[in-house]
Each structure stands twice: as C-alpha cells, then as structure tokens.
Amino acid sequence: MTDLRHYDVIVSPVITEKSTMVSEHNQVVFNVARKATKPEIKAAVEALFGVKVTAVNTAVRKGKVKRFRGLIGRQSDVKKAIVTLAEGQSIDVSTGL
C-alpha cells in the first residue's frame, strides 16, 4: 500500500531530450521535493510504480535570477533525481500516477 508521503516526495517526471536518452539505460528522471533524501526517493518510486530501484543519484539545480519591470527576483531551486531501475523493469512516465 502506498503511503501519502510518497506523493509529496515525487513532484513530477522530467521529460527532456537528455532524460529520454538515459531511459535507454534503465534510468528515469524525476523532480523531487527539496528536502527528500535518497532512501525516501527510492521508497517512493518502489511504492508508487511497483518497480525495483538499484540506485538513486540526485542533483540540485540552482534557480535563475530573473528581472521583471526593473525588479530582481529569483526562481526556486529544483532537486532532480536520476533513478536507476533493475534489469527488465521500466516506468512509463507519460501516464499519470
């Protein structure tokens, strides 16, 4: 049974040219909560998608500085998780949870 906390950990799938390329190597890319840890991300992916996760790599993309009408603002930082799945496992990220 999935815990409601798992839905707070995984924010959205990342669908870019680079994430499509790594999907050929049994990897899936997600935007995750800023405070999520690797064990939490692993547990959430295994519970929500029913797959076996072998590794989780994370990276924090710093937000860009933007200007609007002379005011300087900053976009939020985004944490990205590259999840490696066990051999033969796959996730279709084009469908919803």
Curated annotation (Swiss-Prot):
Single GO MF descriptor: structural constituent of ribosome
Gene3D superfamilies: 3.30.70.330
UniProt entry tagged with the keyword rRNA-binding: yes
UniProt superkingdom: Bacteria
Keyword ATP-binding: no
Keywords: Ribonucleoprotein, Ribosomal protein, RNA-binding, rRNA-binding
UniProt record, GO biological process: translation
Any single Gene Ontology cellular-component annotation: ribonucleoprotein complex
Matching Pfam families: Ribosomal_L23
Family affiliation: Belongs to the universal ribosomal protein uL23 family.
The protein's assembly and partners: Part of the 50S ribosomal subunit. Contacts protein L29, and trigger factor when it is bound to the ribosome.
Function, as annotated: One of the early assembly proteins it binds 23S rRNA. One of the proteins that surrounds the polypeptide exit tunnel on the outside of the ribosome. Forms the main docking site for trigger factor binding to the ribosome.
Designated name of the protein: Large ribosomal subunit protein uL23
